[in-house]
Amino acid sequence: MEKLSALQEQKGELRKRLSYTTHKLEKLETEFDSTRHYLEIELRRAQEELEKVTEKLRRIQSNYMALQRINQELEDKLYRMGQHYEEEKRALSHEIVALNSHLLEAKVTIDKLSEDNELYRKDCNLAAQLLQCSQTYGRVHKVSELPSDFQERVSLHMEKHGCSLPSPLCHPAYADSVPTCVIAKVLEKPDPASLSSRLSDASARDLAFCDGVEKPGPRPPYKGDIYCSDTALYCPEERRRDRRPSVDAPVTDVGFLRAQNSTDSAAEEEEEAEAAAFPAGFQHEAFPSYAGSLPTSSSYSSFSATSEEKEHAQASTLTASQQAIYLNSRDELFDRKPPATTYEGSPRFAKATAAVAAPLEAEVAPGFGRTMSPYPAETFRFPASPGPQQALMPPNLWSLRAKPGTARLPGEDMRGQWRPLSVEDIGAYSYPVSAAGRASPCSFSERYYGGAGGSPGKKADGRASPLYASYKADSFSEGDDLSQGHLAEPCFLRAGGDLSLSPGRSADPLPGYAPSEGGDGDRLGVQLCGTASSPEPEQGSRDSLEPSSMEASPEMHPAARLSPQQAFPRTGGSGLSRKDSLTKAQLYGTLLN
């Protein structure tokens, strides 16, 4: 029983222990279930978070890929832009180089155009100077004939300088005329650097014709002295066309006129040109009293025409007294109404009209007789037929010599009242012949500027005038011209008389050529009294500034003869030599080409 009770007790204890273990197991199971549930929840939460993180990572990765793609695109775009900019940079560099070259070309073109403009300005000024030097024989510029705009320019120019048109009292045909010098000054283009400078002496002198007088005192150098001495070198064709046609008058038949072309100094070519130059209509008694001339010099065969044209334009501008004397003398010359005593009434022509023309036929060959027609557009009708001596008198001085010859003015006064020679004065002369055989304005301008003095006994060693020296250097040979056979001007020769200048003719405007008969009867000594060696300064000043006359009187002295070597010495003046003229010709040819 004890064993049963012991077994019962063991059994009870085992049951208690079993229930305790079961209860403990149940707790553990419950705890395990709760823990598992918790872990499952945590796992799910972790999975959700993992999914979120994974999604996030996926989004980040997609974003990264998108950004990488964008970066790649941007990189490509930047590369393309860089390439484009490089191309544009290269293109701009090429354009810069091209523009630089264009700028250089433009600069060169501007310089060239500036030089051309300067050359054109100088050429225009040269044309204006040539217009001042040109002859207007029979052709007068009228305001009504000029273009309208140019009329306004001329009127403004003349009003600006206080000038007016010539008065109708001078001549009805020239009441509306405009001096050539004014047209030249209007056409002249001034230097841009000197636009504000004052008027030059030459322009003031050109416009002095409205004042009526020149300022007294020594004259300033003319533009004609500087520029116009080589006018023919600029444009010989125009000068040859503008030059007045020469007329040949044989001594045996003074009514037969033939032209003389002085483009070559060979006598044979001259004669052939003379025979065909003028039509038969000119062969009439238009120049009954104009005398013959001499053979042309062949010393400078190719340069003689140029030297003649040079001296033709050595005095150019028309001034106040020139305008008045020119118009008055031309009115008197071409007036149809005065009787025959108009020119013969003066006592100064009593001896000139009594000249004998008998020796003329024996002294000069008929083929070389020639004189000049001052105005081809107007016909000469002299009231009476003057003698050879009077015919040689320039028409410009026929009215001047009617004035009292005893009035003598001081040198400075005469230099103020008289004016330098102009082309218009040369146009009114019959162009006596120099020893070089040229019936040309050269002879007159040479005598005008070279000869000055009233004493016939003086040698011509005072001739240091630049114009005279230039003329001597270009127009006279070393002795070839003076060695020709016929060296006598027929109008000077009188029957049985030795001719020279009369020292008593103190009021003669200028000493002309003073001829004296040589031993063989046809040698002519030409006396040109120099201003520096004249014993009468007053008369010398007057003579050197008045128009020259070719007058000889019978009361002459044979002691006044000069040999050809003495008559034409080589002066040491400041004029141009032949070499200098040729050099200038080459220079002007180069510039104008």
Curated annotation (Swiss-Prot):
This is Brain-enriched guanylate kinase-associated protein. The lineage of its organism: Eukaryota, Metazoa, Chordata, Craniata, Vertebrata. InterPro entries: Tjap1/BEGAIN. The modification N-acetylmethionine is found at M1. It is found in: Cytoplasm; Membrane. Its main location: cytoplasm. GO terms for cellular component: cytoplasm; membrane; postsynapse; synapse. Keywords: Acetylation, Cytoplasm, Membrane, Methylation, Phosphoprotein. The modification Phosphotyrosine is found at Y137. It is a peripheral membrane protein. GO terms for biological process: evoked excitatory postsynaptic potential. Residues 499-593 are annotated as: Disordered. It comes from the Eukaryota. Interacts with DLG4 and DLGAP1 and forms a ternary complex. The keyword Cytoplasm applies. The modification Phosphoserine is found at residues 200, 229, 246, 265, 346, 373, 455, 465, 475, 477, 500, 502, 506, 553, 563. The keyword Acetylation applies.
